[in-house]
């Protein structure tokens, strides 16, 4: 389960960017073709965030669909797998979206001085 290592890195990155402020929410973008299981990330997030400024934070995951462009005709096609066939018959596709793993937003509590 590589999601544990990925989640540990996500927690470390968010922790660094929070500069000690309590994190309320984290928004991730995960591509549907990335071979990363969002449910496993959510499970690991609850464990990995314990004892950090992320403890209790809400993890939101936005799944990005697979999209490719045909090299032959230029058409864009939706992909459910990391490969496919265009309506023109070509298998020469360039992936546009679907393999993302991004920390898109971090919401922290405002620090009152």
Swiss-Prot record:
- Where along this sequence does the record place binding of Zn(2+)? 70, 73, 86, 88
Q: Which InterPro entries match?
A: Hydgase_Ni_incorp_HypA/HybF_CS, HypA/HybF
Q: Which Pfam families match?
A: HypA (PF01155)
- Can you tell me which residues bind Ni(2+)? 2
**Single Gene Ontology MF annotation:** zinc ion binding
State whether keyword Ligase applies: no
Keywords, A to Z, come to: Metal-binding, Nickel, Zinc
Q: What does this protein do?
A: Involved in the maturation of [NiFe] hydrogenases. Required for nickel insertion into the metal center of the hydrogenase.
Which family, according to the similarity comment?
Answer: Belongs to the HypA/HybF family.
Q: What is this protein called?
A: Hydrogenase maturation factor HypA
Q: Which organism is it from?
A: Trichormus variabilis (strain ATCC 29413 / PCC 7937) (Anabaena variabilis)
Lineage at the top is: Bacteria, Bacillati, Cyanobacteriota, Cyanophyceae, Nostocales
Q: Which gene encodes it?
A: hypA
């Amino acid at each position: 389960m590589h999601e544990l290592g990925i989640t540990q890195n996500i927690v470390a990155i968010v922790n660094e960017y929070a500069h000690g402020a309590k994190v309320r929410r984290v928004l991730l973008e995960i591509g549907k073709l990335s071979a990363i299981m969002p449910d496993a990330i959510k499970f690991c997030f609850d464990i990995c965030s314990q004892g950090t400024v992320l403890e209790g934070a809400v993890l939101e995951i936005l799944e990005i669909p697979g999209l490719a462009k045909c090299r032959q005709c230029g058409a864009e096609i939706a992909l459910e797998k990391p490969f496919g066939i265009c309506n023109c018959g070509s298998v020469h596709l360039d992936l546009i979206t679907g393999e993302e793993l991004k920390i898109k937003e971090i919401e922290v509590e405002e620090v009152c001085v």
